Curated annotation (Swiss-Prot):
It is a single-pass membrane protein. This is Putative UDP-glucuronosyltransferase ugt-50. Keywords: Glycoprotein, Glycosyltransferase, Membrane, Signal, Transferase, Transmembrane, Transmembrane helix. It comes from Caenorhabditis elegans. GO terms for molecular function: glucuronosyltransferase activity; UDP-glycosyltransferase activity. It is found in: Membrane. It catalyses: glucuronate acceptor + UDP-alpha-D-glucuronate = acceptor beta-D-glucuronoside + UDP + H(+). Its EC number is 2.4.1.17.
């Protein structure tokens, strides 16, 4: 074959393959308010994954927190921002110390907190709608959004994007299960938010779990009513309810791992994803200075980090003192405490302690892979927990918000560590928990077993996401995935009509037989 003919065939083949790639590519929007650094990082992983799978992917970040205005986490996907959305978020974060001192967030407090926290931001965001016209004009094929902010489903609805996918950054939320008709039995399924229960509950724990589930459903229902009223006032009088919007999603991606999470019933619309980028960045190592920190300690090192939302200086004094006491009573272990670069108060607090160093940032996966790391003391955020389980490191968890309580109890349930509740913390609390996990070998063996199972699952997290996204882009799945319970009333769903019918029949039978026996006795 002549050289020019070969070159022409090669050109045609390349064009054909390139054309096929273009046909299969879709425009995908990942909608991600800057609620926290970990939240934005999670969205970024999904955006990058779908970009690398050949899609035209955009990560859109409405700025809720000015602290994150320069952070997106995306390495490959395009990033669009909407700046100066609201000041309500950062203002509310200023009250974090008060929240940390609360033993429990009560029903009325929860209503007030959520109303102040989310609804004000929703009104601010809706006022920025004209600045989001370019999203509508781009004509996306699919959008992925998170369920945390109650305003998000309503805003996304205005973009007129044909396919929607819900990203649950936690375990399956109570409100999501409720809206999608998923059976949730509080007898063994722990409510997700502010609930330190697992699936094996005592009588009083079940009572508490029923209350937590009821509180969660009512609070989110009232949130949704506030959002709906706002949109019906500002957008359209026939704007659909938030429940209806969520009910019409094509898929729910759940950011937890079935190996770690507690078993529960779910439908085909739910896909457990687990830890994205597992095993990636294995070549990333700690900077020498930080590596030297973790090499210290005769018996090993302990990493202490309560996440970006809860720096060490924001902890109540009694909790700081309890952690200090544990560090001082475990001199053979070296502690590395994560705080912020400008945190002079924590530097002063630990100034006389020999076995502690402070860091403002570390590559967490590199820390968890460190050969000398023996324990991670954490707030229990889902991303941190999944990474720690994957790398086989025991944990001590002090939860702060929402699902972190459930995550901490799951760690205990799996034998991978201990949880301490902030309202119970006294001087010896952290020492008792840390010392126990470090000295009892069962914790290390349990978490290593979990790590082995997570690393050897049949399908990777990346495969699950990309294949399911491609599937829902290509096909309409509602007929096959939607539970009929979506169309049932509360009365039908809980058989209340059947129960009432049986009661009436039983009562009529009782009356009839009573009259028959009465007549017989008289005769």
């Amino acid at each position: 074959m002549h050289y020019s003919q070969m070159r022409w065939m090669f050109f045609c083949l390349t064009a054909l393959l390139h054309g096929s790639f273009i046909v299969n590519a879709a425009k995908i929007l990942v909608y991600c308010p800057s609620i926290s650094k970990s939240h934005v990082l999670l969205c970024s992983k999904y955006a990058d994954l779908l970009h690398n799978a050949g899609h035209d992917t955009v990560l859109f970040i409405p700025s809720y927190s000015k602290l994150l205005d320069n952070y997106d986490g995306a390495k490959h996907a395009k990033v669009w921002r909407l700046h100066n959305v609201t000041e309500a978020y950062d203002t509310k974060l200023g009250t974090l110390a008060n929240v940390m001192e609360n033993s429990h967030i009560g029903f009325i407090d929860r209503l007030t907190f959520d109303a102040d926290f989310w609804i004000d931001m929703c009104a601010d965001l809706l006022g920025k709608l004209p600045e989001m016209q370019h999203i509508i004009d781009y004509k996306f094929d699919l959008v992925i959004y998170n369920e945390i902010d109650p305003c998000t489903p309503a805003i996304v609805r205005l973009f007129n994007i044909p396919k929607t996918v819900l990203l649950s950054s936690e375990a399956i939320m109570d409100k999501v299960a409720w809206n999608l008709g998923l059976p949730t039995l509080p007898s063994y399924v722990p409510s997700v938010e502010e609930n330190p229960n697992h699936d094996r509950m005592s009588f009083f724990e079940r009572m508490s779990n029923v209350y937590k589930f009821f509180q969660s459903i009512v609070v989110h229902y009232l949130q949704d009513i506030h959002v709906l009223n706002l949109f019906r006032k500002e957008v359209s009088s026939d704007f659909p309810s938030i429940a209806e919007i969520i009910r019409n999603v094509s898929l729910v991606l759940v950011n937890t791992d079935e190996i770690f999470d507690l078993p529960r019933s779910y439908s085909s619309k739910f896909v457990y994803v687990g830890m994205l980028e597992a095993g990636k960045d294995e070549n990333v190592t700690l900077p020498k200075k930080q590596d030297d920190y973790f090499k210290k300690g005769k018996s090993g090192s302990v990493f202490v980090s309560f996440g970006t939302v809860t720096p060490f200086r924001s902890l109540p004094e009694r909790i700081q003192l309890s952690i200090l006491n544990a560090i001082q009573k475990l001199p053979d272990y070296h502690f590395v405490v994560k705080t912020t670069a400008d945190d002079e108060s924590s530097a002063q607090f630990f100034s006389t302690v020999q076995n502690v160093d402070l860091v403002d940032w570390v590559p967490q996966k590199a820390v968890l892979r460190h050969a000398n790391l023996k324990l991670f003391v954490s707030h229990g955020g889902m991303n941190s927990v999944l990474e720690t389980m994957y790398y086989g490191v025991p944990m001590v968890i002090m939860p702060v918000f929402t699902d972190q309580f459930r995550n901490g109890r799951n760690v205990e349930r799996r034998g991978a560590g201990k949880m301490v509740l902030r309202e119970t913390v006294v001087k010896e609390t952290f020492f008792d928990a840390i010392h126990s996990v470090l000295e009892e070998k069962s914790y290390s063996s349990s978490v290593k077993r979990i790590s082995h199972l997570m690393k050897n699952k049949p399908f990777t997290s990346e495969e699950r996401v990309t294949k399911w996204i491609d599937f829902v882009l290509k096909y309409e799945t509602s007929e096959h995935f939607d539970l009929e319970s979506n169309n049932l009333s509360i009365i039908e769903h809980n058989h209340l009509d059947l129960f009432f019918y049986l009661c009436i029949i039983s009562l009529l039978n009782f009356v009839v037989y009573r009259k028959i026996f009465k007549r017989k006795s008289q005769s």
